[in-house]
Curated annotation (Swiss-Prot):
GO terms for molecular function: FMN binding; pyridoxamine phosphate oxidase activity. Binds 1 FMN per subunit. The keyword Flavoprotein applies. Coiled coil: none annotated. It comes from Marinobacter nauticus (strain ATCC 700491 / DSM 11845 / VT8) (Marinobacter aquaeolei). PROSITE patterns: PYRIDOX_OXIDASE. This is Pyridoxine/pyridoxamine 5'-phosphate oxidase. Belongs to the pyridoxamine 5'-phosphate oxidase family. It catalyses: pyridoxamine 5'-phosphate + O2 + H2O = pyridoxal 5'-phosphate + H2O2 + NH4(+); pyridoxine 5'-phosphate + O2 = pyridoxal 5'-phosphate + H2O2. Substrate binds at K65, Y122, R126, S130, R190, L191, H192. Its EC number is 1.4.3.5.
Length: 211
C-alpha cells in the first residue's frame, strides 16, 4: 500500500536557544507539563529501545513513573526480554512522541536498577489488581491459553486474600541515566527545530541540530 501522500505541515511556534532551560531535565519537565495540560493521552508513555548481545534492536512502549536529575525510571519484570537485553547491554534509548503538540523528546543513556526500597515504594502504590498481575505474569514467556493466565490470577488472589501483597523478588525498576537528550519541535516545510543536550562532566552542552 502506497501511503507516500500522507502528510501534514506543522504550524507550530519555533523553539529558540534562549527559550531553553540550561538543565535538560527541567526542560523536559516543562514540556511534560505542557503535554499533560494539553490533554495528551498518557503523556508518560514512552518507547524504550534496547539491544541484547545478538545486536538485534528491540522496541516497546512502557510508562515513565518517575524522573529527576538522576534519570528516568520505569518498572518491569526482571525476567522479561527487555530485562535480559539490559543485562547484556545496559544502555537504552527513550522516545516521548507528543504528536498533538508537534513535539518529541529523545533520551539516550546508561541503565541501572533502582534500589529495592524505590521498587517497594512504587509497588505498594499500585492497585491491588496490578500487584497480583506482577506476581502472575512470567513476562515474555510463552503461555498456551488466556485461561491458564486467569487460573493463575485466581490462585494468587487466594494466596494473598488478606494483608499487603509483598514485592516480588523478580520485579522492580530501572533508571535510564541520560547522556544525550534531544528536544524536537515540528516546523513548516520540514524545517524543524532540534536542540541536543550532551552531558559534559557535571554539566551539559546545548547545540542546535539540522532538521
Amino acid at each position: 500500500m502506497d501511503i507516500g501522500d500522507m502528510r501534514r505541515d506543522f504550524e507550530s511556534e519555533g523553539l529558540d536557544r534562549e527559550h531553553l532551560n540550561e538543565d535538560p531535565v527541567q526542560q523536559f519537565q516543562t514540556w511534560f507539563e505542557d503535554a499533560r495540560t494539553a490533554g495528551i493521552l498518557e503523556p508518560n508513555a514512552m518507547s524504550l529501545a534496547t539491544t541484547g548481545a545478538d545486536g538485534m534492536p528491540d522496541l516497546r512502549t512502557v510508562l515513565l513513573k518517575y524522573f529527576d536529575s538522576q534519570g528516568f525510571v520505569f518498572y518491569t519484570n526482571y525476567g522479561s526480554r527487555k530485562a535480559q537485553e539490559l543485562q547484556e547491554n545496559p544502555r537504552a534509548a527513550l522516545l516521548f512522541p507528543w504528536i498533538g503538540l508537534n513535539r518529541q523528546v529523545r533520551i539516550q543513556g546508561a541503565v541501572e536498577k533502582v534500589s529495592k526500597a524505590e521498587s517497594l515504594r512504587y509497588f505498594s502504590s499500585r492497585p491491588r489488581g496490578s500487584q497480583i498481575g506482577a506476581w502472575v505474569s512470567e513476562q515474555s514467556q510463552v503461555i498456551t491459553s488466556r485461561g491458564l493466565l486467569e487460573q493463575k490470577v485466581a490462585e494468587m488472589k487466594r494466596k494473598f486474600s488478606s494483608g499487603e501483597i509483598p514485592l516480588p523478588s523478580f520485579w522492580g525498576g530501572y533508571r535510564v541515566v541520560p547522556e544525550r537528550i534531544e528536544f524536537w519541535q515540528g516546523r513548516p516545510s520540514r524545517l524543524h527545530d532540534r536542540f541536543e543536550y550532551v552531558r559534559e562532566g557535571d554539566g551539559w552542552t546545548i547545540q542546535r541540530l539540522q532538521p
